[in-house]
Amino acid sequence: ETAEQICDDLKENLIGKDISRGKAEETIKDALRLAMLDVMKQEKLDLEGGIKNKNGPYLIMFLGFNGAGKTTTVAKFAHRYKRHAPVIAAGDTFRAASIEQLEEHARRLGVELVKHKYGADSAAVVFDAVKHAAAKGGRLVLADTAGRSHSNVNLMDELKKVVRINEPDLKILVLDSLTGNDIYDQCRLFNEAVDVDAIVLTKADVYEKGGAALSAAHTIKKPVLFLGVGQRYGDLKEFNAEEIVENLLK
């Protein structure tokens, strides 16, 4: 679908255009660049402004499939926005060791963590984290959630409940850049379930070309905020569409 859109735009840009001898490759490349940038066209999301202007804690909820890198992304956000006194909500009460993993991140980062027991209601964990942040004057709550899959209807229904009860200010879909064509289905599944607001692509350092960004942005027409480019807390890079397109054209 993304490729078809790019081809259509490319035809539109080239049909009827005079192409000088020896300039064909350059002209096609320029037209392709424009077509890909058009596919990734997105509204700028002012996350910093949203946090500052919210009357109370700004709630960001992280969603995604198992293994996409949600928990690490939560930690990276806590590091990046530490000046807002973030509180982490251990909303994944399903996966073994998920709470301990977040506890370790919170300890290293020097931020607070709100947790319940395994099997507890995720919606209640997030609710308590927001309440705790408000009482402490924290400006930001970062909520981890259990990894979903196509087949697990119960977990998807639970996610809808967590969103419905807590009304997050921002729902971020965390996607693995190495996913391949399955990225279409993941984008649609989550967007149809909870109306995703933005995207973070992980493992972008492993697959540097950036085709996943092109597919994700086009599939659900939502902005890509950051790329995960390593395992360190600071390895969260602001998304740059022009840079991605240049990588794809190399």
PLM region descriptions:
Residues A146-R148:
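Short glycine-rich anion-binding loops that position phosphate/pyrophosphate groups of nucleotides
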Residues E1-G91, S98-Y118, V126-A133, L140-A143:
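Primarily NTPase-proximal linker/entry elements flanking Walker-type ATP/GTP-binding cores
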Residues Q101, D121-A135, H150-K250:
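Conserved catalytic-core segment of NTP-binding enzymes
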